[in-house]
């Protein structure tokens, strides 16, 4: 290995020796932007970033660290050009330990944005002004340095067998905690346990910093290096909130059919938790756990086989082809959920009475629980009888027959994913059933760093039973065996949950980093072999460990906690405020997660009271759009769904991923009573800003949970300007060129109002009611040279991301323009003059033009033969 500048010099020498390549200038070393001297870490010579830095803390420039990397040359050169902007912090202790904490110095009266783990699996944003304001398990912190018009990021890293996070200290101190996860793995000295970087642009800051870490660590890849899964451009349905653990072939078939009947058939289906062969310790090894309904009931169960459970094994090939599962009652899953909920509430009440009052005579309540259990079991017996119905002409059975029939019936269905936990099931595998994988139940030992996180049923359950862990030496075989079977029965991908369990299982396996490497290497190889190298959605993975070790191949993952349709703790207002919390999770996590994976904003339900609010965010998030609607016609809002997806199950996806605007970065849009969340993204022919009122809830450091703040659930106002879109983050979007100084047409989705704005215009004011939103599209105005006509296409305005429906636009002559759009609905454009003629798919079409506003509009039909694309042309 050699220092970065030497490695790049040798690379450049090779390039210069080959005439096919344009010569690249050898690197010129610049003085590093940081300097640690006399207890102060300063930027750009004299601006203090951290005060009172302990003497045992070191700083070394990035360029002085040796590298051995497989990073592509463009990334290497980019990192080389910015090497002077960053460096590493380390520290030394007298005694080695498996968990070390040290101050990096202190800061006060500096605005910061940070991301911390509020649960073992999930991260969210937090702001403040002092090192003492940080939360435990902080993944990174961004400091605003206005005196030099810059931003500084401090990012805990992985060094050797240790993973680090930031935590608050007293009197403004920032503490770093490095831990191995095993008392057998100890260290006393670190050279690169945190990375620090400076930049004058907060978005470039994160890109540059994580590019540097990609080159330095060589254990992950950036998003730009990887292919995305096919589902990213598509509309889908996930079974989780629809039916929880009651999922079965009839439920899935009926669900897909309901979407098809409504006019939008999913391109992908995710069969969530409930399809696996699992049971509990003490159960017969070959018998599946039965009659499970609600999430939580399965969390102490273990995987007994890679094959599907009885519900799916019993499927008879051809059963639903002729009947279309018409025997199935679509309301049955919801009925099971309601009955199971009633039963669990009675059980919880019983526990509460015993705990709080020691009440002994609970005969009446016990009888109620017994009756509810019997009623629930009877409902399942009825379901099993229905499942036994089928065709006499059986063509195969089980999951293979079911996926084959599903695709045969629903021609537009491309992908079928299934759920599994990283370790198999929630509590791993039953060791007795997987002896060849050297599986063993390992105790689940939580890090002290997680002591300040939110109470979590999932964590409680895995702590209770431990996890049946496949030996890390068998991780490759484990994943390949599971995934090769799934691929053989027609499954094309996996949603993998519960990633962070490994950190608490590492005592006997060389620590959390080494255990994670073994598992993630196995998962990576299996993805390449069985799932096209791309078809895995990562979930419950929002820890730096995952991003630094697991993302060589994984290219998409969740950036928010689950969609919670109501507050599990019983606040009736949670049905509203939890939706704003979800927006914050996804928006701010995308700042760092988007460097390595395509952000996935999760599913939602189209009949939810805040469904439009969610739909607007999904329309511009840049990721896939999928729902978890219950079954039954009343559970789907197809008018809303058709604002998100085309008839063929594709979506008008933005070309980037959504990010908070610069003036939202250091604000608290959850409970400061004044801030609107603004996110921006790009389309091929413009940009878009989403504005959301998320006020009404937030993290309580005292109670370690999210809670409602009723006094904050109020109307808020703000401003929107074309400069809120960071055009340089996507130089391919029309109008993003630095030289463009023209006007933008602005379209307000809620009011259908249009106006004009340029870089010198005043910002427009916007006011949003609680749980309200608006979408504003910005399209560069094109001026025809000969006639002076000004024109800007908005696309199909019946779609939330209307400009995303514009596939192409060209000036085809002195006085003519051609626009290609995808979809069906009302096309709108701004035109300063009425066209002489308008053509739709080469036929003259009638149009409406408003002289007062310049709105030009007409109806565009869906053209099946061209994949929904219509060709429009205008002559002036």
UniProtKB/Swiss-Prot annotation:
Which protein are we looking at?
Probable galactinol--sucrose galactosyltransferase 4
Q: Give the reaction(s) catalysed.
A: alpha-D-galactosyl-(1->3)-1D-myo-inositol + sucrose = raffinose + myo-inositol
Short name of one Pfam family: Raffinose_syn
* UniProt-listed Enzyme Commission number(s): 2.4.1.82
Tell me which residues bear Phosphoserine.
7, 9
What does the sequence similarity comment in the record state about its family?
Answer: Belongs to the glycosyl hydrolases 36 family.
**Species the sequence originates in:** Arabidopsis thaliana
Task: Show the GO MF annotations.
Answer: galactinol-raffinose galactosyltransferase activity; galactinol-sucrose galactosyltransferase activity
In terms of PANTHER family, this protein maps to: GALACTINOL--SUCROSE GALACTOSYLTRANSFERASE 4-RELATED, PTHR31268
Q: Which UniProt keywords apply?
A: Carbohydrate metabolism, Glycosyltransferase, Phosphoprotein, Transferase
